[in-house]
């Protein structure tokens, strides 16, 4: 016990956790770039965001946003345009969630509910079908860019 807390009364034990994040839907475009039309972006070079500050939550998601921002930055510098991932992919669906309009934006991990759903998927194998569709979308995206 911490001596200074010896007389403290605890209503509930727990932990404190705080996320620092921006309102990504308001400030970032589909590539996690600061929207150039915003006043705060007028006098600075193009700026991309990644990690927890975007409202993604989790280590894997932090890596995904870092890769995604770097990929789109490179595409913009080298080719003059960005190259987002398909919405059917896990990373693409998370990125869409980070930048789509949302009045009560809060950090989120990836989950299968972010992927586009189609009628008729049975609960029994729904995640498996969505995962296969996500993998296929990424493979097609890679093949279309001759990166395989």
Predicted regions: what is each one?
Residues 53, 72-148:
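Glycine- and aromatic-enriched mobile tails/lids
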């Amino acid at each position: 016990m911490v001596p200074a807390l010896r007389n403290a009364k605890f209503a509930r034990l727990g932990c404190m956790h705080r996320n620092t994040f921006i309102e990504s839907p308001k400030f970032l475009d589909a590539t996690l770039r600061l929207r150039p039309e915003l006043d705060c972006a007028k006098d600075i070079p193009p700026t991309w965001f990644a990690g927890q500050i975007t409202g993604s939550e989790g280590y894997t998601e932090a890596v995904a946003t870092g890769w995604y921002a770097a990929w789109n930055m490179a595409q913009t510098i080298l080719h003059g345009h960005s190259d987002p991932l398909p919405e059917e992919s896990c990373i693409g669906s998370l990125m869409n969630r980070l930048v789509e309009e949302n009045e009560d934006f809060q950090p989120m991990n990836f989950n299968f509910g972010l992927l586009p759903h189609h009628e008729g998927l049975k609960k029994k194998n729904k995640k498996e079908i969505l995962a296969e569709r996500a993998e296929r979308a990424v493979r097609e995206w890679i093949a279309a860019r001759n990166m395989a």
